[in-house]
């Protein structure tokens, strides 16, 4: 990558401003002041701005985050804090959520700067399953699991939901696995059968399960196996 492009990404400024900073001798490579933005960087080089190291990124990045309540999954929001607050990573604003959660929903969020990978997570064509832990206002009706297996009619939609698996933990606490991503789908499915979701926590996306060791607001890089599992055929 060219130095000027790298600095533009790292500093979040235009290349014109990067050129000004280079002329001001604020950038060094391996301890030497550089003024040309055309230099091609190599991964082992030590790039610094005002003496502060700038980390070179090799390839796309993938993380799992345990999202707490009160944060939105967009990268910018004028009214609410975003999940980027938790990501102590260079150029964090380049990351986006592969499958968002509502502000009051907690649990697994996948963060990446790989657009094709996130498309495989969210595209209906790939049928990526998601599992949620759901707390309900009322005890579950005996026929709800079968209704979800058959598909339910959501308000103001023509087609039934795809078959979903419902496992009862307690009368008002269940685990739901769906393979779609309709708007507010879990909440609307329970509303369609006369119940209401009180708490919603996502545990799994595809073969990626939220790490039990991650406290709310904590994150970790995905493993090579977890990254490769997205979009892989299930035999």
Swiss-Prot record:
Reaction it catalyzes:
uridine(516) in 16S rRNA = pseudouridine(516) in 16S rRNA
* Record's keyword terms, sorted: Isomerase, RNA-binding, rRNA processing
> What does the record give under GO molecular function?
16S rRNA pseudouridine(516) synthase activity; pseudouridine synthase activity; RNA binding
For this record, the Gene Ontology CC terms, alphabetical, are: cytosol
Q: Which domain of life is it from?
A: Bacteria
Quaternary structure (record): Monomer.
Role summary: Responsible for synthesis of pseudouridine from uracil-516 in 16S ribosomal RNA.
Q: Return the protein name.
A: Ribosomal small subunit pseudouridine synthase A
Q: Which organism is it from?
A: Yersinia pestis
**Name of encoding gene:** rsuA
């Amino acid at each position: 990558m060219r130095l000027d492009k790298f600095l533009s990404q790292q500093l979040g400024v235009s290349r014109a401003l990067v050129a000004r900073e280079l002329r001001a001798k604020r950038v060094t490579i391996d301890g030497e002041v550089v003024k040309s933005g055309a230099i091609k960087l190599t991964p082992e080089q030590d790039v610094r701005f005002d003496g502060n190291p700038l980390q070179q990124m090799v390839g796309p990045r993938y993380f799992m985050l345990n999202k707490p309540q009160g944060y939105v999954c967009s990268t910018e929001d004028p009214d609410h804090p975003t999940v980027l607050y938790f990501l102590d990573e260079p150029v964090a604003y380049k990351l986006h959520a592969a499958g968002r959660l509502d502000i009051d929903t907690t649990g697994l969020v996948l963060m990446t700067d790989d657009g094709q990978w996130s498309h495989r997570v969210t595209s209906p064509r790939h049928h990526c399953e998601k599992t949620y832990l759901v707390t309900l206002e009322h005890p579950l009706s005996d026929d709800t699991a079968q209704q979800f297996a058959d598909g339910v009619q959501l308000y103001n939609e023509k087609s039934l939901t795809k078959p979903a698996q419902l496992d009862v933990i307690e009368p008002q606490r269940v685990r739901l696995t769906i393979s779609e991503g309709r708007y507010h789908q879990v909440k609307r499915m329970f509303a369609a059968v006369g119940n209401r979701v009180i708490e919603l926590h996502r545990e799994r996306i595809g073969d990626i399960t939220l790490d039990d060791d991650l406290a709310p607001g904590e994150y970790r890089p995905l493993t090579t196996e977890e990254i490769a599992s997205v979009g892989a055929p299930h035999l």
